[in-house]
Amino acid sequence: MEEFIKKNVDEEDVKSMMFNSIRGNERFVQIINTPLILSRLIEIVRYKKEIPHSEGEIIAEFLNCLLLREKEEKQDARLDIKRLTYLLRMIAFESLENKEANSGMTESEIIKYCVKAMDTYKFEYDTLYALDIMLQLGILEKRENMYVFSHQAYQDHYYAMEELAVIQS
């Protein structure tokens, strides 16, 4: 793990924060012991200069940072993080409720899930633009004309957000 950090992190302050967070903290080392979680944690530390302490927090913060960075760097007035998050929540929720795990979705299924999100939460948004952003940021991938979440952890995160909203309503 230390070799991975040395090899993939140039910024001394980020290296220092990473090393300080893992020294003597075996539980945290176990949490970040996969390349996905470790690489996402590095990106969070680069962007926010803070360390989330659970796998769920790391995934949530990474996805949030990804959207914030895209909004700030591109200065894209059409990128509405809140609405995009509602769409991702519904896509994750509906796809997991209707299918097994991270199985593929057609474009028409994704559009249907997005329309449901917009109806449920009473907003409008350009669905094809949103889908393009989700693909550009690597939240979703297109494989053989089917769309999937790039990582099961992303789908699980957005599913949990929507499930909580359903329970609380």
Feature map (PLM): residue ranges:
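Extended hydrophobic
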Residues: 1-166
